[in-house]
Structure formats: C-alpha cells, structure tokens
C-alpha cells in the first residue's frame, strides 16, 4: 500500500472541507449519492480530488432561498464561494472554506454546474461557458501536499479544525 505524503496541516484543513463538500451532495443536490475520484502525484506532491453529483445544481439549490430566486447560473457560481451564501439548508460555509483552502494550499479549484465552470486561482475568477450541460455539480480541487498552512485560517477561526481532526483521526497516544 502506498501512503500519501501529506503535510498534517493540509490534512487537518482538507478533512473539514472534504466533509463539507460531501455533505453538500447529501444536503443540497436532492440526491442520495455522489461520486468521488482522487489522484495523488507523489513526484510533484499534488493531491487532486473531484466530487460530483447529478442533482439539481447550484443555481436551482440557491434559488430555494428567497434571496436568490432570480439568480443566474454564473451568478450562483460566483457567490457560492462567499461566506454565508446558502439555500437555507446549511450555513453557507462549506464552499467558502474550500475556497480558502484553495488559496492557502491549492493549485486549482473549479466548480461546474449546468453549462458553466468557474475556475478560481488566488483572487481571480474565470468562467467557461457554452459547455455541454452538466446535470448537477462537480467540485474539483488540486492541493499541494507538502506545503504547511494554518488550518484555522481555512475555517476563518470559527471552529477548532485541528482538534477535530486529531480527535477523529489520531489515537491519543499519537498526539
């Protein structure tokens, strides 16, 4: 078995964000299942993962909130990574914290829904349009696995993500 050589601070932040992305499938897509694909490049220390579903998509999900009933698909993509943007079923923190992880340790962060893909690098947002329609949502993230980050910044200091990770994944004698 090959183990991924990954900086603990990246794991601590990634575990929180990965859970949030998976929870988005169950909470917001109107589907019970999604798909996860991962790839690790040990030579370049890059972990890639994709989470996809064939649910209602980001625009339809956000439009369940009265505040976003007239939102367009590109607008939905651009605001879904902002803090507290939600369809009313969540806190609006999962994709926001994932965007912070991408800023701290990421190479690529993309969200696809409907006919649009949004690529986020640093503070630049780029849209690709005229794509074939994707029923649902795809979240794709590439991370540096050898870069030390501050996991608390990824969650905007709202939760003790380090303690959560350690309690969930480490034995007491490993601390």
Q: Positions of the model-derived regions?
A:
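Amphipathic alpha-helical surface "interface" segments used
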Residues: 16-19, 100-102, 161-163
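Catalytic glutamate of the conserved HExxH
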Residues: 20, 24-25
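N-terminal assembly/transducer modules of large multi-domain enzymes
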Residues: 140-175
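Conserved short strand/loop->alpha-helix "switch" segment adjacent to the catalytic nucleotide/phosphoryl-transfer site
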Residues: 1-19
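Conserved beta-strand-loop-beta-strand hairpin that lines the nucleotide-binding pocket
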Residues: 26-149
